[in-house]
Amino acid sequence: MIKTMKRKTIHLFGACALLLASCTNLDPDIYSDMTIDKILEDSEQSSAYLLTPMYGQMRWFNEDRSIWDLTELGTDAWVIPTNSDGGWYDGGIWLRLDNHEWKSTDPHFSTCWSHLWYGITTCCNRVLHQFEEAGLELDEQTLAEVRAVRAFYYYYLLSLFGNVPIMETYDVPKDYMPTTRDRKEVYDFVVRELRESMDKLPEEQRYSRFNKWAAKHLLAKLYLNAESWLGSEYAAKRDSTLILCNEIIGSAKYQLDDSFSNIFSLQSETSPEIIFAVPYDETTGSPIFHCIYAKTQHWACKPIYNAGSGGYNGLRAVPSYVKETFDATDPDHYNDKRYRQSYCMGQQYDYLTKQPLYFTDGVTPFNYVNEIASIDAAREFDGYRFGKYEVKIGQKWETDQDWVVFRFGETLMMKAECMLRDGDAQGAADIVNEVRRRSFDPSLPRSVRELTAEQLSALTVVDGVSVPYGEFLKELGREFTGEGMRREQLIRWNLYVNGSWTFHTPKQKKYLELYPIPSSELLSNINLRQNDGYSY
């Protein structure tokens, strides 16, 4: 059932692929000469067809210079150094991102801004407008789904840029220029959208479409981050996170997967843990799931997977993060299966011959090491690579792996974090160990397999700073590395601008917890204002 649902959705994504070819043109002719009433009359999957663009747009989140980059790069976990041959310098944009010295003209910001606003205006608001224009009433469930998905796009604008416009309608005057709203106002808007829509959504598992539980999960994340985004007066919102997590748990719709690797396998739609995912399929083409293969693997990696194309040798794990989070010299971490399931490391072998591989010089072993010689002259073999998602044997340029957005493991860990911060360390430890259990051999000593309440609540050094609940933060890293959460985690622990890691010296400037509004947008809209701390 789940498999069929995924494939049907993928075909719908493919049918609208041409509609998503441009993220900067916000006024495409989405349905050509097909009217809304004609679609509803002719299509058994009318609502799915109409809503396809707003889900299909999410496939751009993991493209190069997009959302994944702004949620994981610039943190203690991942980096793109300049290679010794000059590759990946790209005008210094990756080095500036790692050093927190970015400019409002850097392409990441305009790309992400365009992708998110395309999702809101062209993919969500236009659907609502077309129904209104046709004089048709959108059913309550479909309207709730559009509002929840629109809130999903707004969540990322709120997290990354903070102070942004609010646009609920598509039909605006030709020269309309939306006005910047304060972050708190945007937060209140997203909360309202989710609260008013979530209970009108279906309860059954839908994998690649929003249901009631996906909306509640998103709202729980919103409340969890509220204090770090808006101030200490929002600390009480953790109570709401706890309530929402308990509702998801109590629904009995999801459970932890017995296999951590299955969540990120080519058959991820079979995982009982996934609440919401974005499907990719190699037959539907661009955009590709860039960070899991092309962006991270070396260009000589084809024999490892008998692949049709190699990688770009860019994305690497930050060595200090690997050592601090998954220290291979510490048996407690080496026995953690997530260590080898999260990274591509060590000597690589030819899939067909099983023989060890060498780099292009034919002499240097193809052996990824947990060190980077220089941030501006990295060697070919420097750095562990992102290996969390299964790479298909015979991998093409297009990818066949689905992006896991929300999963039940995160629901549990959000609950545990709230309990820990509110003084119930033992309750938090019980949940943490429930999640950890699958990643350790049961024959190992309990002291290896489990974390204690004392460990989780103690002051612990992370990124050179002694912080409360530091071991819990490390555990978040072990469980969720590379899943687009690290920036928010570091901000909640006040480490994003205060922590130190390989090649990164802290700037200790609070305003850097928000990215700048892209300069191109400021030039085209006089009603936008730049975030505090940025001159342009």
Predicted regions and their residues:
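Hydrophobic, small-residue-rich alpha-helical packing segments that form membrane-like cores
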Residues: Y170-F260
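Flexible, polar/acidic helix-loop-strand segments at domain edges
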Residues: W94, D98, D327-R407
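Long, intrinsically disordered, low-complexity segments
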Residues: S22-N25, E44, V79-P81, G87-D90, ...
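Conserved, well-structured interaction surfaces
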Residues: E44-N62, G86-F161, M177, R181-D188, ...
